[in-house]
Regions:
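Conserved "landmark" site that anchors the functional core of diverse proteins
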Residues: 1-334
C-alpha cells in the first residue's frame, strides 16, 4: 500500500466504489457498487487489471496532489480533467508523476465520472467490497486533506491507451416484464412505450424520477405486498410517476413494478442528467438474455479494444520521456 494522492479539494459526492456486494440481498443490503458498471469495467480494462476499487465522482471531482508516480484511468461522465493544467482525454489511461496536480472539475455530460489508479485504491472492505453505501453507513466518502493509497500496480507499462465511447446511445432503453406488468392494461403499457420521459430533478444513487404528462397509476386499489426489488426495477408510486431504481436502491418495496430495465442499459439511466429524454421498449425474456450475453461479451473484450492515444506534441508536458526518433537510419543502407 503506497500513498498516491493527497486530496486538496473534493466534490460533495465522491466515493470509493467497486462492483459492490454479491449475495447480501437477503440480509437487506443491496448490490451497491458503481452506478455505471460499464464505466467501471472500462477503467479496469484500460488499466489492464482486475476488480480494483475506484473513485466515483457525482457531478464534480476534485483537486489532488500526486505523491507517487502512477497510472490513472478516466471513464464514465466526461469531466474537465487536467494534469498540471493540460487537458486529459476521457476513456483513457494516463501517467502521473510526483509533484504534479490532478484537477477533475465539473461533468460536461453525464453524472458519474470514474477515476481509477494502477493497483486500485486501498480502503477498508466490508464483506469483500470496498464500495460506499451511504444508506447502510458503509465505505468512504472522500474528504479534503485525506491521503489516498494505492495497491501494487501489476501492469505499470500499460499507458497511453484509450477506449472508443461505446456506451452513448439514444436508442430506447430495453425493459422486460415483471411479476406486476400484467396488472397494467394493454393500453397503459403501450403508452409507457410511446411516452418520452424526462429524467427528473429528483434522483441519486438510489434511483431517478421519470417525468411526463402521463399517469401510470393503477386503478381499482390493488394491494401489492412488499417484495424484493433490485436495480433496474421501475416502480409506479400512487401518484403515477415511474421511478427507476439504481445501485443503492432499497431491497424491498410495495409499489407495482411496471417493467425492469435490462442490466446492460442501467448505466444509461444512471448517467442521464435532469431533463434528458428517456424512452423504453419491451423485449421478451429470450431477447433480453441474448442482449445481455452480447453485452457481457463486449465487456470481456474491452481490454482488446484499447488503442494507442494519438497525441498532439504541443500538448505533451512529458515530451522528453518519449522515444521520438525510433527507426532512424544512417543513409548508406540503401
Amino acid at each position: 500500500m503506497t500513498p498516491a494522492l493527497k486530496v486538496q479539494k473534493i466534490g460533495p459526492a465522491v466515493t470509493v466504489q467497486d462492483a459492490g456486494w454479491r449475495g447480501t440481498l437477503a440480509s437487506g443490503l443491496s448490490r451497491g457498487g458503481a452506478a455505471d458498471t460499464f464505466a467501471l469495467e472500462s477503467v479496469w480494462a484500460l488499466l489492464g487489471q482486475g476488480e480494483t476499487a475506484v473513485l466515483e465522482m457525482a457531478g464534480f471531482g476534485g483537486t489532488f496532489d500526486v505523491l507517487h508516480s502512477a497510472r490513472i484511468a478516466l471513464a464514465g461522465a466526461e469531466m474537465d480533467a487536467r494534469l498540471d493544467g493540460i487537458a486529459l482525454l476521457n476513456n483513457a489511461v494516463h501517467r502521473i508523476e510526483v509533484g504534479q496536480v490532478l484537477q477533475i472539475g465539473a461533468a460536461r455530460s453525464g453524472v458519474y465520472g470514474y477515476l481509477g489508479i494502477g493497483g486500485g485504491f486501498i480502503t477498508p472492505r466490508f464483506q469483500g467490497s470496498a464500495s460506499t453505501h451511504r444508506g447502510a453507513g458503509l465505505g468512504q466518502v472522500i474528504e479534503a486533506g485525506q491521503t489516498l493509497s494505492m495497491g501494487h500496480d501489476t501492469a505499470p507499462e500499460r499507458t497511453g491507451l484509450a477506449l472508443p465511447n461505446l456506451s452513448k446511445s439514444t436508442a430506447p432503453l430495453r425493459v422486460v416484464a415483471t411479476a406486476h406488468t400484467e396488472l397494467f392494461s394493454t393500453n397503459m403499457l403501450q403508452r409507457f412505450e410511446e411516452t418520452i420521459f424526462t429524467r427528473g430533478v429528483k434522483g441519486n444513487r438510489q434511483g431517478v424520477a421519470l417525468e411526463s404528462e402521463q399517469s401510470f397509476a393503477l386503478t381499482g386499489g390493488q394491494s401489492i405486498p412488499s417484495e424484493t426489488v433490485i436495480p433496474g426495477d421501475i416502480q409506479v408510486p400512487g401518484q403515477g410517476a415511474p421511478f427507476a431504481l439504481l445501485a443503492d436502491s432499497q431491497t424491498t418495496g410495495g409499489y407495482p413494478r411496471i417493467a425492469a430495465v435490462l442490466p446492460c442499459d442501467i448505466p444509461r439511466v444512471a448517467q442521464a442528467v435532469a431533463g434528458d429524454a428517456l424512452r423504453f421498449q419491451f423485449v421478451s425474456r429470450e431477447e433480453g438474455i441474448k442482449i445481455e450475453r452480447a453485452d457481457r461479451k463486449l465487456r470481456l473484450d474491452l481490454q482488446k479494444r484499447c488503442t494507442a492515444i494519438l497525441r498532439d506534441p504541443s500538448q505533451m508536458s512529458d515530451l522528453l520521456s518519449y522515444q521520438l526518433i525510433s527507426g532512424a537510419i544512417s543513409g548508406d543502407e540503401i
